[in-house]
């Protein structure tokens, strides 16, 4: 499991994408799968920034885990 916590700032959306891409490399995804997962993470992080926290003082947490080959990404 990997836990990441960052400020609710739109610049940190890119960090979430990079960390996710590095984490999922062990699954050997093709480019389409990689793009789909990174897009989903971007949208989830952006939604947290826009709708949950209206200032950069809010914290967003992201947990990435896998069990039996199933990837789980939780963003809150």
Language model features with spans:
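Conserved short strand/loop->alpha-helix "switch" segment adjacent to the catalytic nucleotide/phosphoryl-transfer site
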Residues: 17-42
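Conserved polar catalytic motif of the HATPase_c/GHKL fold
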Residues: 43-47
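A short, mixed-charge helix-start or loop-turn motif at secondary-structure junctions
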Residues: 1-6, 26, 30
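Conserved beta-strand-loop-beta-strand hairpin that lines the nucleotide-binding pocket
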Residues: 1-3, 48-76
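STAS-typified acidic loop motif
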Residues: 3-15
């Amino acid at each position: 499991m990997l836990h990441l916590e960052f400020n609710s700032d739109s610049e940190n959306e890119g960090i979430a994408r990079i960390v996710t891409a590095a984490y999922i490399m062990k699954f050997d995804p093709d480019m389409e799968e990689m793009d789909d997962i990174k897009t989903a993470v971007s949208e989830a992080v952006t939604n947290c920034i826009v709708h949950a926290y209206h200032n950069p003082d809010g914290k967003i947490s992201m947990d990435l885990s896998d069990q039996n080959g199933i990837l789980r990404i939780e963003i809150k």
